[in-house]
Regions:
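Conserved acetyl-CoA pyrophosphate-binding loop and the N-cap/start of the following alpha-helix
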Residues: 73, 77-85, 211-218
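Hydrophobic adenine-recognition pocket in adenosine-nucleotide-binding enzymes
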Residues: 6, 67-69, 102
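Active-site rim helix/loop that mediates acceptor-substrate recognition in acyltransferases
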Residues: 18-42, 49-54, 151-183
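Amide-forming acyltransferase catalytic core, primarily the GNAT-like/NAT-type
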Residues: 116-196
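Conserved active-site alpha-helix within GNAT-family acetyltransferase domains
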Residues: 80, 104-122
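A short, internal acetyl-CoA/4′-phosphopantetheine-binding micro-motif in the GNAT/acyltransferase core
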Residues: 67-75, 202-211
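Conserved GNAT acetyl-CoA-binding A-motif
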Residues: 90-105, 220
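Conserved beta-strand in the GNAT
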Residues: 48-56, 63, 68, 183-195
Length: 220
């Protein structure tokens, strides 16, 4: 048994147990190449590959994603060992925080995270929106924003801790917008989905239904 970095030659073996993870399938085949390029795509091998996870290291935080275990080898702490391996690398590089995004109905992953002393940090709602032509909206681009008020934003499904530089860069690219009506303000931070073309991921901070509607109209 060993944990090593995955290579392009491992893809076929991994995809055999990454097809029906969710009701709609899985996304691992779409991100495989980009995760290989980023590095830190860890593979648990027991004669054959039986588990993977990817780690994204950014400043003092670790983002652990894409944990997949062959169903024939579950309940053997393979996922826990992969996560611990990713954490150790982070600790050696002065990481202070480790995060995972887990569906609230994924009881097995929640149990695994709890067993490793992870705690629920925040609970978010996810909605999807299809494009629609609309030129009637009341929004403005934000030129400055406080990272204490908006401490995180989503980029390629990673909850990234904001910094002054990140927010300035996003503002320069017109990726922070707000709507202010009747003293209520909603703000949206637009992130890219690097692994899927023509897809945006938007972090919304809603102040009222009316201002949220204006932002959604613009995003469409």
């Amino acid at each position: 048994m060993e944990i090593r970095n995955a290579t392009s030659f491992d893809k076929n073996s991994i995809m055999k147990f990454c097809k029906h993870t969710f009701s709609w399938g899985d996304y691992i085949d779409k991100v495989w190449s980009s995760w290989l390029e980023e590095g830190n795509l860890f593979l648990f091998e027991q004669e054959l590959p039986i588990g993977i996870c990817h780690a994204f290291y950014f400043e003092n935080q670790i983002w652990i994603e894409g944990i997949r275990i062959d169903p024939n080898f579950r309940r053997q702490m393979v996922a826990s060992k992969l996560v611990t391996h990713a954490e150790l690398i982070g600790k050696n590089n002065n990481a202070s925080f480790s995060y995972m995004l887990i569906d609230t109905e994924n009881k097995n992953s929640i149990y695994m995270a709890n067993s490793l002393n992870y705690e629920i940090f925040q609970t978010w709602n996810y909605y999807s929106l299809i494009p629609k032509k609309n030129s009637n909206f009341k929004i403005e681009f934000v030129k400055s924003i406080d990272s204490d008020v908006f401490p995180f934003y989503v980029d390629s499904w990673r909850w990234i801790k904001t910094t002054k530089k990140i927010l300035v860069d996003l503002s320069t690219q017109n990726k922070i917008i707000k709507s202010n009506l009747n003293g209520k303000t909603s703000v949206a931070i637009i992130g890219d989905y690097k692994h899927l073309a023509k897809t945006l991921i938007v972090t919304l901070f809603s102040g009222s239904f009316e201002t949220l509607f204006e932002i959604l109209s613009y995003l469409q």
